[in-house]
From Swiss-Prot:
<dbReference type="GO" id="GO:0005525">
    <property type="term" value="F:GTP binding"/>
</dbReference>
<keyword id="KW-0862">Zinc</keyword>
<feature type="binding site">
    <location>
        <position position="149"/>
    </location>
    <ligand>
        <name>GTP</name>
    </ligand>
</feature>
<feature type="active site" description="Nucleophile">
    <location>
        <position position="128"/>
    </location>
</feature>
<dbReference type="InterPro" id="IPR032677">
    <property type="entry name" value="GTP_cyclohydro_II"/>
</dbReference>
<feature type="binding site">
    <location>
        <position position="70"/>
    </location>
    <ligand>
        <name>GTP</name>
    </ligand>
</feature>
<protein>
    <recommendedName>
        <fullName>GTP cyclohydrolase-2</fullName>
        <ecNumber>3.5.4.25</ecNumber>
    </recommendedName>
</protein>
<feature type="binding site">
    <location>
        <position position="154"/>
    </location>
    <ligand>
        <name>GTP</name>
    </ligand>
</feature>
<keyword id="KW-0686">Riboflavin biosynthesis</keyword>
<keyword id="KW-0547">Nucleotide-binding</keyword>
<dbReference type="GO" id="GO:0003935">
    <property type="term" value="F:GTP cyclohydrolase II activity"/>
</dbReference>
<dbReference type="GO" id="GO:0009231">
    <property type="term" value="P:riboflavin biosynthetic process"/>
</dbReference>
<keyword id="KW-0342">GTP-binding</keyword>
<feature type="binding site">
    <location>
        <position position="67"/>
    </location>
    <ligand>
        <name>Zn(2+)</name>
    </ligand>
</feature>
<comment type="function">
    <text>Catalyzes the conversion of GTP to 2,5-diamino-6-ribosylamino-4(3H)-pyrimidinone 5'-phosphate (DARP), formate and pyrophosphate.</text>
</comment>
<dbReference type="Pfam" id="PF00925">
    <property type="entry name" value="GTP_cyclohydro2"/>
</dbReference>
<feature type="binding site">
    <location>
        <begin position="92"/>
        <end position="94"/>
    </location>
    <ligand>
        <name>GTP</name>
    </ligand>
</feature>
Amino acid sequence: MSIKYVASSTLPTPWGVFDMHGFEDTETGKEHVALTFGVLDAETPTLGRIHSECLTGDALFSLRCDCGFQLQTAMQNIAEAGQGFILYLRQEGRGIGLLNKIRAYELQDQGANTVEANEKLGFAADMRKYDMILPMMEKIGIKQVSLMTNNPRKVKAMQELGIEVVQRIPLQVGKNRYNEAYLKTKSTELGHMMSEHHFSTDGES
């Protein structure tokens, strides 16, 4: 994989002004983004998140998943901490692409869960890769991470690339009546680490 840094700019947001760094995978043509906030120090743990693209959740405010809620909460947490980063990876639909994701949603509307839908379409449950994050991390100057995630695969991916994950910070937000079954499937079949309280019927997270 060949990741090339392209350019940087400021990105004003409701939570503060981030810096946006653009990268291109010259083999696939995919474009990835790193957002940074504040002054980053390679020698101290930095609050951060690896976030895979979710057009429906991030931009269209879908309640079928928790992605948009996680992205916004991560940005807010970083702004409140005064420094941090988000790697925004173009891996829509856990790596199957937008149109296949819509096909999977159609199967879910007919009763399949998120894993079953992917498999019925001939895909693995999660096809994402994370090898592109190392050159992105090197460019923004981060070696130690306090990682906001419920996904143990992201922790493992960073560790295998030689990035020290000092701690994992749960990011349990956005549960609602449309995505509760989806969140349960992520926990029971994909190994995401979520507390039982997150699935209680007493209110919504």
